Amino acid sequence: MRVNVTLACTECGERNYITTKNKRTNPERIEMKKHCARDNKHTMHRETK
């Protein structure tokens, strides 16, 4: 079952990306490095509710 999740920047808190994940294979929150437009650099983005 794939669900839509929002990724938020850990430094500024802005929600920049929307992606999908499979809850069965990845039950924990996902983290990935993405570009933050507000900070203008690559930062860690974490899944939010």
Swiss-Prot record:
UniProt family annotation: Belongs to the bacterial ribosomal protein bL33 family.
GO biological process: translation
Annotated InterPro entries: Ribosomal_bL33, Ribosomal_bL33_CS, Ribosomal_bL33_sf, Ribosomal_zn-bd
The name this protein goes by in its record: Large ribosomal subunit protein bL33A
Keywords assigned: Ribonucleoprotein, Ribosomal protein
Keyword Nucleotidyltransferase: no
Gene transcribed to yield this protein: rpmG1
Annotated Gene Ontology cellular component terms: cytoplasm; ribonucleoprotein complex; ribosome
GO molecular function annotation: structural constituent of ribosome
Pfam families documented for this protein: Ribosomal_L33
